[in-house]
């Protein structure tokens, strides 16, 4: 006798089908935390000077934290994206970590356009839709679609630095000593590691990752 075995379809929908601006909640230190779908696929520049340094590893669902976190400070401007991966991965479960792509992100170094390969990073100035130009016509990436229509400014709540957060972009004038952060006024500013600016994690989900709807515009991993 021949038995036809049908596989049950996987629950939920693919995160790669969500609209930019929708929310995926993941547990961070046991607390459901909102992450915004910031882009689907490889970001496309809407200006001039993009150095084209995204590769296929970035062809997924870009997620950015809705709120700031007290993450690690910039330390002597070494490879801080590795530090934020270690810090962030310690707060999430294995299922979530496995859904995040190892991706190659562009950034500006002392020698010019460069890349860093990591799972969790900080947004670049250009990804937040700022036009901070480096040598020649090089930008560190391209705008994420969410920030074409939404501000990168975080709400000011009273503390002079509570709404400030680091980018992964280094200073064009002094990349050895200064990095760029987004201030509560909305300006991109540079500072050394003495700044109390916070972290806004950015990562890319595998587009086939399944999510389930919990309310309008809000999803969780299935």
Predicted region positions:
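Collagenous Gly-X-Y triple-helix signature in extracellular proteins
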Residues: 1-222
């Amino acid at each position: 006798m021949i038995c036809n075995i049908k596989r049950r379809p996987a629950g939920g929908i693919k995160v790669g089908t969500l609209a930019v601006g929708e929310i995926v909640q993941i547990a961070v230190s046991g607390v459901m935390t909102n992450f915004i779908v910031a882009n689907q696929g490889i970001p496309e520049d809407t200006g001039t000077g993009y150095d084209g340094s995204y590769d296929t590893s970035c062809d997924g669902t870009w997620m950015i934290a809705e709120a700031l976190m007290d993450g690690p400070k910039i330390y002597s401007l070494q490879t801080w994206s590795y530090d934020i991966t270690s810090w962030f991965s310690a707060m999430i479960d294995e299922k979530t970590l496995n859904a995040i792509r190892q991706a190659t992100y562009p950034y500006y170094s002392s020698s010019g356009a460069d890349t860093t390969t990591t799972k969790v990073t900080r947004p670049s100035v250009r990804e937040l839709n700022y036009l901070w130009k480096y040598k020649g016509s090089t930008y560190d990436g391209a705008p994420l679609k969410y920030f074409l229509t939404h501000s990168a400014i975080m709400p000011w709540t009273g503390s002079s630095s509570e709404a400030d957060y680091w980018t992964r972009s280094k200073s064009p004038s002094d990349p050895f000593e200064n990095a760029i952060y987004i201030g509560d006024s909305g300006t991109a500013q540079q500072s050394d590691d003495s700044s109390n600016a916070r972290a806004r994690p950015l990562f890319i989900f595998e587009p086939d990752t399944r999510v389930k709807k919990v309310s309008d515009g809000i999803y969780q991993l299935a």
